[in-house]
Amino acid sequence: MWTIPTYILAAFAEIGGCFAFWAWLRLDKSPLWLVPGMASLGLFAWALTRIDADFAGRAYAAYGGIYILASLIWMWAVEGTRPDRWDTIGAAICVVGAMVIIFGPRST
C-alpha cells in the first residue's frame, strides 16, 4: 500500500541530496548546502529500506523507474526546464518497467 509513496519519498530525498552537492560544486553555492543535502540522502537510504520487498536488488530495480520520472519532475519544477517528448517517452517506458517489477506475480 505504501510502496509507491515510499519510492516517491526516496526519489525526491535522493535528488534533493544530490542536488545540494550539484549546487555546491557546479553552481558555486555555499558548502552549507551539504548539511541538508546529507540529511536528505540519509532520508533517502532510510526510505528505500522501508520498501516491502523480499530482495534489495528488486527494490532498487523498481526504484530506478520511479527515480527517472521524479528526476524529470525535479528538472521541470526546480530547474525550470520542461522535459521534452523523448524524456517523457523514456520515463513512461521506465515507469512501466518499474510497475512490472513491483506488481508482477511472484512464485512462492
From Swiss-Prot:
| Keyword Kinase attributed | no
Bilayer topology: Multi-pass membrane protein
SUPFAM superfamilies noted in UniProt: Multidrug resistance efflux transporter EmrE
InterPro entries, per the entry: UPF0060
- Domain of life of the source: Bacteria
Q: Does the keyword Metal-binding apply?
A: no
Keywords of the record, alphabetical order, are: Cell inner membrane, Cell membrane, Membrane, Transmembrane, Transmembrane helix
Q: Where in the cell is it found?
A: Cell inner membrane
Q: What is its main location?
A: membrane
- Segments spanning the bilayer are 4-24, 31-51, 59-79, 85-105
Cellular component (GO) terms are:
plasma membrane
Record-linked PANTHER family: UPF0060 MEMBRANE PROTEIN YNFA (PTHR36116:SF1)
The UniProt entry's sequence similarity note says:
Belongs to the UPF0060 family.
- Put simply, this protein is called UPF0060 membrane protein amb3269
Which species is listed as the source?
Paramagnetospirillum magneticum (strain ATCC 700264 / AMB-1) (Magnetospirillum magneticum)
